[in-house]
C-alpha cells in the first residue's frame, strides 16, 4: 500500500479504479482503462484496486458501489464517480488536473 499512497500523493493526477473480479461493469471498464493508460502516458497514473483484497482502502474512501473511480492529485480526491465510464469522459477528467 505504500506504492498506492505514493501514487495518490503525486503531483500527477492519479485515476484509481476500485473494482472486483466478479463485477460485470468492472470487467467492461478494464479495457477502457488500459486504453486510457496508453493515451495519457506518463502525464497521469491509472491504477486498479481490488476492493475484496483491499477492504481497508475501499472503506477509507467510502467505496459503496463498484466500479468507483476517483481522481487524486496531491493526495486529495478531485473527482469521483461510480459506474461504467467511457474513454473520452475519463480522459477529459484527467486532463483537467494535469
Predicted regions span which residues?
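A short beta-strand-turn-helix
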Residues: 1-13, 55
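Short pre-active-site segment immediately N-terminal to redox-active cysteine/selenocysteine motifs
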Residues: 11-12, 19-22, 65
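Hydrophobic beta-strand anchors of alpha/beta hydrolase catalytic cores
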Residues: 15-16, 46, 69
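Typically the conserved alpha-helix immediately C-terminal to a functionally engaged Cys/Sec
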Residues: 27-40
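Structural microenvironment flanking redox-active thiols in thiol-disulfide oxidoreductases
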Residues: 51-57
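Chalcogenol-based redox active-site neighborhoods
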Residues: 60-61, 87
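Structural micro-motif
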Residues: 62-70
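Non-catalytic, surface beta->alpha helical segment in thiol-disulfide oxidoreductase systems
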Residues: 73-98
Amino acid at each position: 500500500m505504500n506504492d498506492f499512497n505514493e501514487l495518490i500523493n503525486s503531483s500527477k493526477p492519479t485515476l484509481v479504479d476500485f473494482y472486483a473480479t466478479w463485477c460485470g461493469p468492472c470487467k467492461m471498464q478494464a479495457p477502457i482503462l488500459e486504453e486510457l493508460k496508453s493515451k495519457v502516458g506518463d502525464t497521469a497514473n491509472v491504477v486498479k484496486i481490488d476492493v475484496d483484497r483491499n477492504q481497508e482502502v475501499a472503506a477509507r474512501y467510502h467505496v459503496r458501489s463498484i466500479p468507483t473511480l476517483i481522481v487524486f492529485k496531491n493526495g486529495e480526491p478531485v473527482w469521483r464517480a461510480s459506474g461504467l465510464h467511457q474513454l473520452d469522459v475519463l480522459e477529459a477528467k484527467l486532463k483537467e488536473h494535469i
